[in-house]
Amino acid sequence: MPDGYSIRSGSHPLRPARPAAQIGPDVPQAATDPVPLMILTPIPADILPEALERMAAHLADRPQPLAAFHRIAATWPVPGGVDTPEQRADGVALAHAHGIGTLDEKPSASFMWDGAVIRVDVEATVIVHEVAHWLCAAPERRGLLEFGLGPGPETSRRAEARAQQTQTFQQCMHEEAQTSLLGILWEAELGHPAILAFLEQNWMEAWERPGTADWFAGHAAELFERGLIDADGRPATVRDWSDKRRADAHGLETAHG
C-alpha cells in the first residue's frame, strides 16, 4: 500500500478540507500516487438529488444493495452539525461497544491503530472508519500496526508500520473499499451525515453510469455475505447496543415531541 493511501479522510464544503484517497470504478492511475487526493468530481447540491435518484434506479433490481444505498441517501440533506463533540463521542462509544480500546491522542503521535487502541483525537467520521477497519481486517491482523496495511497519512512512525505490512496493494485497495462502505453505513446507523463521507470517498463518481452502481452493489453484497451488514443494509455487529441506542434516541424524540 503506497504511503499516504487511505480512505480515512476526505473533503466536502461542510467539512474542513483534509486529505482523501479515492475508490470507485473510475479512479485514475494517479490515485495510486502516495500524495493524498480529494473528491474527483464534486457534485453540486442542486444536482445531488438527481444523482441519488439515478443511482437508485441503477440498483432497482438488486434489493439488498438498494436498501444499503437508501440508508446512505436518507442522510441528505444534512439536518444538523458535522463533526460535533456528540458525533465524536458516538464514534468512541461504537469502538468500545466492539471491545476496541481508544486513546485520546492525535494519530500523528505514532499510529492511527497500534494493534491495541484507536487514537481518537480526529474527526468523528475517521473514528467510525477506523472501527470499520477493525471489523474488516482478518482477526490475525488486528494485532498489527495499521492492521498490516502499511502507514496511512496520519502515521508518523512509518518505518515500523511498513515493516508490519502484510497486504499487497490490490488487497489494500479492496479492503479500503470494504472499510469505506461499512464505515459509511455505520455513520448512517449513528445518525451522522453519512452522505458526506459517501461523496468524499468517491462512491458517486460518474454517477450517471451503471458501472458506478455495479461497483457499489458488489461491495454492499460482499459486506452482506460476510455478515457485516444485514439485508436492509444495516450494520450487523453489536446489534443489542445499536438497538438500545435507537430506542433511547426514539424516547428522547417522543419526550420532546
Question: Model-flagged regions — what are they?
Answer:
Residues 2-19, 23-104, 232-251:
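A metal-dependent hydrolase signature that marks the N-terminal structural subdomain at the beginning
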Residues 186-198:
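Substrate-binding/catalytic groove segments of enzymes
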Residues 100-110, 117-120:
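N-terminal "first-domain core" detector
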Residues 125-138:
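Active-site recognition of the HExxH zinc-binding catalytic motif
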Residues 106-114, 137-176, 198-203:
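Post-HEXXH active-site segment of zinc metalloproteases
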Residues 34, 38, 195-257:
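Pan-zinc metallopeptidase signature
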Residues 113-126, 169:
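Short pre-active-site segment immediately N-terminal to the catalytic Zn-binding motif
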Residues 173-188:
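An active-site-proximal "capping" alpha-helix that borders the catalytic cofactor pocket
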